[in-house]
Design a protein with these regions (language model features):
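Short, Arg/Lys-rich segments that mark the N-terminal edge of DNA/RNA- and chromatin-recognition modules
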Residues: 1-35, 84, 224-226, 231
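C-terminal secondary-structure termini that scaffold catalytic or DNA-interacting sites
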Residues: 2, 188, 224, 233-260, ...
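A short, charged, amphipathic alpha-helix used as a generic interaction element across diverse proteins
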Residues: 37-54
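Short, Lys/Arg-enriched alpha-helical recognition elements, typified by the DNA-recognition helix
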Residues: 46, 61-152, 161-166, 182, ...
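Short, basic (Lys/Arg/His-rich) helix/loop patches that form interaction surfaces
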Residues: 126-130, 185-196, 205, 254, ...
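Basic, Lys/Arg- and aromatic-enriched nucleic-acid-binding interface segment
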Residues: 130-134, 138-142, 153-215, 222-223, ...
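Short functional hotspots where side chains directly engage DNA or cofactors
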Residues: 162-164, 224-229, 320, 331, ...
Length: 381
């Protein structure tokens, strides 16, 4: 079988040529042409995928390609998607998209079908026919939309019908935040627990769970009270891996409050004693700040489970581990920091993201500011 070829058509357009489909009586396959928009490397990856389908006998004529076959082919291995994202996309495709739209020919999908599908998910797309949240339905629509955009680039379809159907509106909900009194109670009840230094660190920095699990001592400067966020730990079905921050804003330096520095110094001493017992010697710059007791990496999902267990066993406020990040952000806002500064410290892609999540907190500060202005302008007697 021919290895196929790639010919440039424009600045970012390529024609992929390969032999595909069922062979005729002479054993010859029909020559296929596919237009691809993107970089040459991406075009080469796509050609390799198409040839692999032909070899595996799973190649289908574009007009006969169903949504199920297309999504499974795309999500079989997309080099542009992070492993965790790919895992989540596959889950959404298999659970929310394919059971409802999978049998429809990709080229025959219409906006009305997408609209009806979203309604079905909202009413009973969950396990046992339970309703799905608008947020989850929106995630499923995003997977379909992204898949159709790719099919459009490949000229398998002439338009992306998902563009005509907006995602269901997600009602704004206030995030879980610990009050000052609750913070004190949590730290008091956790004192002496292995999670204590992690919780203090999370509250004091607002770092994400994966960033905390992936933090190495080489990125911590206790003398300068500074931490460099350079990577995150990601957990997928294939195991653990370190990955760079999602956006440029995610790579940042975070200053440490004095009490967090003190807790980290004590934690490092305790960790050193534990390493000596294990015969591991002094912790190096590549060693993790918050590993498991045997010095192995602390999986982010396990951290969440351990937090949930200690919440129940010690009667702590019923909030997720991520709520510690929200609590940190709320403290910054309450202290009067502007949205740009808050966004920079917690590593959001843009201040707009920060405003979307914490709009109600900024509004309360604005109300206080308005009241202060009114008081200042009140006539003196």
């Amino acid at each position: 079988m021919s290895a196929g070829s790639i010919t440039r058509r424009g600045a970012h357009s390529w024609r992929l040529k390969y032999e595909g489909g069922e062979p005729d009586p002479t054993g010859k396959r029909k020559t296929r042409y596919v237009t691809f928009r993107g970089t040459k490397r991406e075009a080469q990856v796509e050609l390799t995928r198409l040839l692999d389908e032909v070899r595996a006998g799973t190649s289908v004529e574009p007009s006969k390609l169903t949504i199920a076959d297309y999504l499974r082919g795309w999500l079989g291995s997309d080099p542009d998607l992070a492993p965790k994202t790919l895992e989540r996309y596959r889950q959404l495709a298999e659970q929310q998209i394919i059971p409802h739209l999978g049998g429809i020919a990709l080229q025959k999908l219409r906006p009305a079908q997408v609209h009806d599908w979203l309604g079905v998910l909202l009413k009973g797309g969950g396990k046992g026919g339970r309703p799905l949240s608008a947020r989850t339905v929106g995630h499923a629509r995003r997977v379909l939309h992204r898949g159709l955009e790719r099919a459009l680039r490949l000229e398998i379809i002439s338009r992306n019908v998902a563009r005509a159907v907006p995602a269901p509106k997600v009602n704004a909900t206030e995030v879980d935040i610990l009050s000052a009194e609750q913070i004190g109670d949590v730290l008091h009840k956790l004192n002496g627990n292995p999670l204590y230094p992690i919780v203090v660190f999370a509250l004091g920095t607002g770092m994400r769970r994966g960033e905390i699990c992936g933090l190495a001592w080489g990125a911590v400067d206790l003398d300068k009270a500074l931490v460099r966020v350079e990577r995150s730990m990601e957990e997928t079905a294939a195991g653990l891996r370190f990955k760079p921050p999602k956006t440029r804003a995610g790579r940042r330096s975070v200053s440490l409050p004095p009490n967090v520095v003190d807790v980290l110094r004590a934690h490092r001493r305790d960790q050193m004693a534990q390493r000596l017992l294990l015969g591991l010697g002094r912790a190096g710059t590549d060693d993790l700040v918050f590993p498991l007791a045997d010095a192995s990496p602390y999986p982010p999902d396990k951290l969440s489970r351990d937090w949930g267990n200690v919440v129940r066993s010690r009667s702590l406020p019923k909030v997720s581990f991520h709520a510690l990040r929200h609590t940190h952000a709320s403290a910054l806002i309450a202290a009067g920091l502007d949205v740009v500064s808050v966004s920079k410290r917690i590593g959001h892609a843009s201040p707009a993201v920060t405003l979307t999540i914490y709009a109600h907190l900024f509004q309360s500060k604005d109300d206080m500011a308005a009241a202060a202005i009114e008081a200042a302008m009140r006539p003196r007697r």
